Swiss-Prot record:
Belongs to the protease inhibitor I11 (ecotin) family. It holds the Pfam family Ecotin. GO terms for molecular function: serine-type endopeptidase inhibitor activity. This is Ecotin-like protein. It comes from Rickettsia felis (strain ATCC VR-1525 / URRWXCal2) (Rickettsia azadi).
Length: 162
């Protein structure tokens, strides 16, 4: 009987400890690959929300470049990979152009300065919101990653037949 009480108390303390220290590191979740020497790895832990099916996460990447009054952007590619044996997705930002594309307007009196410039990643930047798994993204070292959480409002419009 005394052993059962000790076991029960141990389990209670262990459960309290685990709940208090629930911030899991990435290696506690799954064996995601380490970044290469030319990459950095971003890990986004999303908070639990009540209606996650109404949310989306948009990934946005930037890279520093000279910018004046012209529209400037870099090309790039967002590739989805699956963690073998686990089935979890992770993402790789790749093929980021060395030189930005730009409109060619004259900018009299405007001096170009170094600013963060968008990296166009294609049409796959909207991801399903899932607070149970982190979003893991590998990017070149010169690229910064940002994200936006999009909320669907409660108004659903009907399309008209025509």
């Amino acid at each position: 009987m005394q052993n059962k009480i000790i076991l029960l108390l141990t389990l209670c303390f262990l459960n309290t400890y685990l709940l208090a220290n629930s911030d899991k590191t990435l290696k506690d979740i799954a064996p995601y690959p380490l970044p290469t020497d030319s990459q950095k790895r971003y890990v986004i832990h999303l908070p639990t929300e009540s209606n996650e099916e109404k949310l989306k996460v948009e990934l946005q990447a930037t890279k520093n470049a000279m910018k004046d009054c012209n529209r400037v952007w870099f090309g790039g590619k967002l590739e989805t990979k699956t963690l073998e044996g686990w089935g979890y997705n992770y993402y790789i930002i790749d093929q980021v152009s060395d030189q930005p594309a730009s409109t060619m307007m004259a900018c009299p009196g405007i001096k170009a300065t170094i600013k963060p410039v968008s990296v166009f990643l294609g049409d796959e930047t909207f991801l399903r919101y899932n607070s149970k798994l982190p979003i893991v993204v590998y990017a070149p070292k010169e690229v910064e990653l940002h994200y936006v959480i999009w909320h669907q409002n409660d108004i659903i419009n009907s399309a008209k037949e025509g």
